[in-house]
């Protein structure tokens, strides 16, 4: 799949017209397996593919983190694998969905506390990574439309 995606990107979406993102959520492999209980690449595999995927003129590949309390988040662990010239960081809050509530996760990105958000971003920036704080429309939390999970559960729709 990913080799085909690379061929499509190179053929039709050159020069920054394609955005690739990997959701990592932690810099620790064991924590990632707990947070993402599905078959995933490890950090080294993501880095190796990213190095093959990136071409001069492309957008940087995004490494997305929705960091949670108690989960390792050490930007220094990324440096040996991910070049800041090819990879950037996106920090997002954990949306207050029913699934997030059941998991017991408490997000470190609090949209109401810009100072703490900036502090986390600055840790990545200190290692040379361009870092984007991606805070969505907070009204979505009030009506339960984020990720569609709340609406699906309230209506009995399952995947």
Label each PLM-derived region with a short phrase.
Residues 48-60, 65-159:
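Auxiliary Fe-S-binding modules of radical SAM enzymes
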Residues 1-72, 88-91:
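Conserved SAM/AdoMet-binding glycine-rich loop
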């Amino acid at each position: 799949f990913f080799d085909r995606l690379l061929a499509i990107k190179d053929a039709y979406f050159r020069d920054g017209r394609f955005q690739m993102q990997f959701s990592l959520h932690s810099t620790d492999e064991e924590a990632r397996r707990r947070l993402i209980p599905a078959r995933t690449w490890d950090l080294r595999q993501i880095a190796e593919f990213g190095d093959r995927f990136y071409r001069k003129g492309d957008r940087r590949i995004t490494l997305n983190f929705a960091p949670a309390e108690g989960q390792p988040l050490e930007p220094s662990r990324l440096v040996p694998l991910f070049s800041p010239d090819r990879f950037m960081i996106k920090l997002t809050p954990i949306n207050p969905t029913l699934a997030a509530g059941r998991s017991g996760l408490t997000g470190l990105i609090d949209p109401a506390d810009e100072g703490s958000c900036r502090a986390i971003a600055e840790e990545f920036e200190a290692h040379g990574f361009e870092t984007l704080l991606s805070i969505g429309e907070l009204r979505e939390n009030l009506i339960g439309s984020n990720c569609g999970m709340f609406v699906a559960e309230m209506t009995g729709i399952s995947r």
